[in-house]
């Protein structure tokens, strides 16, 4: 047996012994009749205490005679004979407890407290004071075990090191990792900030179906499910777009939705099959209005949540305070592949030759517009580090966007990039029902030719357009990728509480 195998065996034995001991302690608690009491109430969290009292001297605290009640998980304990120091962790952070045998009811310190384990959840009451080192602490006069933890916490010095374990057992990651807790607090603040921003601009939040008879609103492979009562195959939605635009037809002129989308595709540092999007639709507006809205949204969120418009990410600093870069797709190709002749992008054969020269395998179903888009993604996308809007997307890859009035081969559409990643997609909406029907048919033809991400023909949506969709602009922003940027996270699984994982066999 190798040394590493021996260490692994020892670790299993130690864990089994620990589990056995903790279960025996719980059995003893059950005999006492109250293993999981539910009558303790706290009046402060740790962050509230630090905010209100960290600046005060010990003499001030003694004069104030502040009595508090707190509850949380015991993370550390230093027993020094008749007295101990405990670190208690709650939703707001950590607070130190000073526990003295002589200040607790008889028998509590030796017969109960000393037998409790790290990870147990405690309730404590006492008076605030500061130690000689100036640390705000609670001098306990009451201490109770509220929940017995049957499993030990991750090693206090190394935390939860295995990345996969962090995702599978997110609860342990949140207990032991301050940065992980901070990430998900920021995520919550971003969601709340978006809602505040949108409502402030007179948008109404709505909910649309998660299961759809016809998946639409994006080019992606859907998940299929079956509705037993209707005996009908249905699809988890890939986007809410077509339902949201039906609402604009119905007279709700500014709507938005924050919810999940599902796409039956690969998993990567940027992709999770189940992800969160914010989509909005605004009547009597065009894509240029949404470029302004997007800039304002990101600038506002950064300032309100992070306190600055300069957001660090790896070796870069994204500056949301400056005007965002704006390039057409062709300008971006030329900028990052200077040898490209712009005229060559207008011709199928020459565009195909460029694509193949840079390693792109051109599919038979692709037209010239799709090829140009693939060239852009290959040569330019990774270089779009600072906030950048790319405009003038080909109509071929924009089946729901309005054609440009001057050049019908392109659309009034933009995609928004930061850090070399697409964060958002917006455009002036196609409201010509006949044009939309033809583009749906083109998508059906592409699907028949082998494109399994092409859209279905949605006759009901075309019928809605025939009743009249006012001039409208729409925008979708990936919340997960936005959170990655604001938290300096480099994989999407770090910003999704429970990312998709293969089951452990």
Curated annotation (Swiss-Prot):
Q: Which GO terms describe its cellular component?
A: cytosol
Highest taxon, organism lineage: Bacteria
Cofactors: Mg(2+)
User: Among its keywords, does the record have Transmembrane helix?
Assistant: no
Q: Pfam families from the xrefs?
A: tRNA-synt_2 (PF00152), tRNA_anti-codon (PF01336)
Residues at which Mg(2+) 1 binds:
415, 422
> Where does this polypeptide localize?
Cytoplasm
Can you state the subunit structure given in the record? Homodimer.
Output this protein's name: Lysine--tRNA ligase
**Species of origin:** Enterobacter sp. (strain 638)
